Structures are given as structure tokens and as C-alpha cells.
Amino acid sequence: MSVIREKLSGTGDLLLRPGHVLLPEGPRAGMAVVVRAGVFCRVDTAEAVERDYPDLLPLDLPDHLLMPGFVDAHTHLTQSLGKALVFGEPSEIFRRIWVPLEGSLDERMVYLSAKLAALECLRGGFTTAVDAGTRSEGHIGALVRAARDVGLRSVVGFICNDLGGTAHIPDADVILRQAEAHLSTYRRDPLVHPSLAISIPEVASDGMLKAVSDMAGAAGVVFQTHVNEHLVAVERSLVARGRRPIEHLAHLGALGPQVLLAHSTLITPHELNLLRETGSAVAYNPVASLWKGNAVAPALQMAALGIRFGLGTDGTRADGFRLMDAAEGLQRAGFGLATGDSSCGGGWLWLDRATSGAANVAGLAGVTGSIAEGLAADFLLVDLDRPEFTPSYDLMWELVRYGNRDQIDAVFTNGQLRLWQGWPVDWDARALLAEVRGDAAVAIAKAPIQRIHPLSEAHRHLGYYK
């Protein structure tokens, strides 16, 4: 395996001949791919590729699947320092934990948090992550540097709240100028793709919601916001505006194909129709529903209606295989069992919405998400020589049900090997872990975090459980 790693780490062209390639139409044997200048320049039968590229020495990987990297349709890279503080907490943890924590981070801690989260993304097979924006003041550049240093492709949201929810609230005209500057700065970056965000509709004025959505649409980038996740937020919207959050966005004309709505779990049939009619997209975050949500998004119904959606972690757990398993499992538990639906979309649906479907909602359908000529060479080499994949009859289902991140041998973005068997090949990840362990406690202690429950040891001693 060390020989394979050495060959994959080179800077020249690669001709890879894996046992299987996961193409948009499904896994295929007897294929080969050529990676040149960071993109897939040829995907064809091994015979055709070797004939047309006689100068390249094929690298045989008979026990591996070459598949697209996962695309996390919704995450928060600057929340990794507090990720273990939210277990068992009631809804709207952003008010008590995330806003206070992120708002207290200085530039260095934003960098460390984002770098740690980006490393976790790559370890979990995510070659791309859609970040909803940091609430820290003026440190989005540190987040971008961290993601770039690790080699994670990222869609980075610039938060445009004008009524609250961040460390500092500039005037509306300043926010819009900063948003324009954000779009301009990263418009042609090879790994960083700009996006605009409003944390939740209630922390922005109607004028800002409409302006930011329109700006994103005109620029061809994604506008992100969280909607219909918690019952209390839906009720606040009804009281303040007379409409549910998605209904209010539709009323303002702020929905559209540029819009990516995180969660959309408490959603009515009318709101589903609004999403379908406007072409708006959803980040389906199944693990977030399990850990801290009020409901499960009706993803199968969205698929049947033609509503675009991709799978997101919401910063919960960076493992693309376990995310797919949770996505299918929650649809089965929440909807399939009651209707006798034994397929619940099938393995192919969840593979698609974790890769190309997620790239689509992220605004990156022409950039990544598939093994296809002209797209960025963002891919995984998954070891199929494992008990979990033996015997193999239906690889797409098997990846959803039996896949795990420890089966990923190599992670590539832009044609460059970033991780080998879970660890970076060109920087010291363990030094990062030591630095985070040394400084995270101080950062947490400084933040005005409010937890409702004590940590597990205190729970045990107080008699909450035996």
C-alpha cells in the first residue's frame, strides 16, 4: 500500500484502473480514468483509455472503488470546538451555544476550529462542504484559509443578518457592500466558492432577505438560510409575520433556484408546493433531526415532487457513509414503515443525494459531484476487499448500508491526494489536534454559553440515569 500511496502522491497525470468506478449510471467494472490538471480528462473503458494514453503507466487498483467524494450540503466549520457540548440539549441550541461560542472566537481560534472541521470532513469522505457562514466578527478569511490549507472544496456563506444573530451587526448598506466584496473575492477561486447567507429569516429585515436572495441569484451563487426546523421558530414567524418561514420567503419573492434551505422539517403540503414551483432546494440533515430537531424532512416526498435536495451533516458527524444510512433509515422509520415501503428510495437515491444531488443544490453541478469528464477530480478510493462488501451483489445498497469512513484509503480534491487512510499526506494533523486540545477549553470558558443539562458525569452522579 505504501507503493500505491507514493504513486498517487505524484504531481503528474494519473491513469487509474480501479476494480469499479461509480459513474452517474451506477458502478462499472473495466473502466479507467485519467486525471490531468486537477480534472477528469478521460473516463472510458480501460481498453480505450490505455490506447489513447500510451505514455501513461496505468495504476492498477483491483480491490478499490473509485467514487465521487461526498458533498456536505450544510455544515458549520466554526462550530467544531463545541461539538461535544450539545448532546441532549433542547432545540435552538444556536441561541445558547453556537452564537455565543462563534461570536467569542478570535481569528486564530476560527482558523483552528475550521481546520479541525475541514479535516473531519475529508476523513469522512466529504471532498466538498457547504458552510453556512461564521458568526464571528470579521474572521471569514480565517475560515477560508483553513479550508484551503486542508484541501477541502468549500462553499462559504457570508452572513448578512441585519437584525441579530451575529457578533456584530453593521448597517444594511455596509452588509450589502461586504456581501458584494465577498462574491468578488472568491469568484474565480479554484477551491472556494462564495455564497450569501442569513442565519434564519427572523434575524433579517424583509428588505435584506429579498436583496440578498436577489444578489445571490444575479451572481449565480447560493443563498442559504435555516427554515422550519424548530416548532418555536415557526410559531414566532406566525406571530410576527402571519406566515410560516417558507411562506414568508415566498411572499417576499425570496425563493428561487438559487436558494438552499437547511432543514425544512416542519413543512406543510402548501410549502412543498412553493419549493417545487420556485425551484428552491433543501439540505436534508437526518442526523441533525435525530440529535436535536423536532421532525424529519419528508425527503421521499420531495424526491417524488421533483424538489431538489442534498444530504447535509449540519456539523453533527462527518461520515458520508453513515449520513446516507441515517438519511435512508429516518425515511424508513418516519414514513416507510407506516406505508409498507420496503425500498424508501433505494440505495441509488441516497448515493445520488450525497454526491451529485448535493453538488447540484450547492450550485456546483458543473464543478464536482460525479466521475465525469471535465469535472474536478474530487474522488475517493474505497477499499472493497473488506468483509462488509463480501459477497457483493448490489454495491449501491451496500455502500449505504455497510460503508464506513475507515474503508476510505484515499481522498482527492482537484486531482491532489489530500488524505491517505484517514491522515493528511502533506501536513501534521496530530500537531493540530494537540493545539486544539491545548486551547479549546480556554475558548469555551470565555464564551457565554448556556447549557440546559450538565455533562454526562454530572448527570450520573445526580441520579438522572443508572
Segments (PLM) and residue ranges:
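Alpha-helical scaffold segments that flank or form the walls of functional sites
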Residues: 83-152, 175-188, 437-448
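His/Asp/Glu-enriched, well-ordered alpha-helical/loop segment
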Residues: 251-258, 300-386
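Metal-coordinating catalytic core of metallo-dependent amide/deamination hydrolases
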Residues: 138-265, 270-272
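Active-site microenvironment of metallo-dependent hydrolases
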Residues: 1-31, 35-41, 52, 352-466
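A conserved active-site cap/scaffold subdomain adjacent to cofactor or substrate pockets
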Residues: 269-270, 276-312
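Divalent metal-coordination and catalytic microenvironments
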Residues: 19, 33, 38, 63, ...
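Active-site gating loops and adjacent loop-to-helix segments of metal-dependent hydrolytic enzymes
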Residues: 81-112, 151, 158, 163-173, ...
